[in-house]
């Protein structure tokens, strides 16, 4: 199954708070997840990510959603890539 990094909604009415989680793509938005990768508060615009966990899931083939990519940009997260230089 495909693993997605996506937002899981918490909070109260008109005060959303999100967790960034890794979950299987067929699970519900607020359903079962594999691991919590961080949090995102939209009101205060605060992003907290565990960069090691995010990098681990990216290297294992997890695909971030469009919204999670925007959250990564806000937190200034840069994914490490394995670039090989050929001579």
Curated annotation (Swiss-Prot):
Pfam families: Ribosomal_S16 (PF00886). It comes from the Bacteria. Keywords: Ribonucleoprotein, Ribosomal protein. InterPro entries: Ribosomal_bS16 (IPR000307), Ribosomal_bS16_dom_sf (IPR023803). GO terms for molecular function: structural constituent of ribosome. GO terms for cellular component: cytoplasm; small ribosomal subunit. Signal peptide: none annotated. GO terms for biological process: translation. Belongs to the bacterial ribosomal protein bS16 family. HAMAP family: Ribosomal_bS16 (MF_00385). This is Small ribosomal subunit protein bS16. It comes from Onion yellows phytoplasma (strain OY-M). The lineage of its organism: Bacteria, Bacillati, Mycoplasmatota, Mollicutes, Acholeplasmatales.
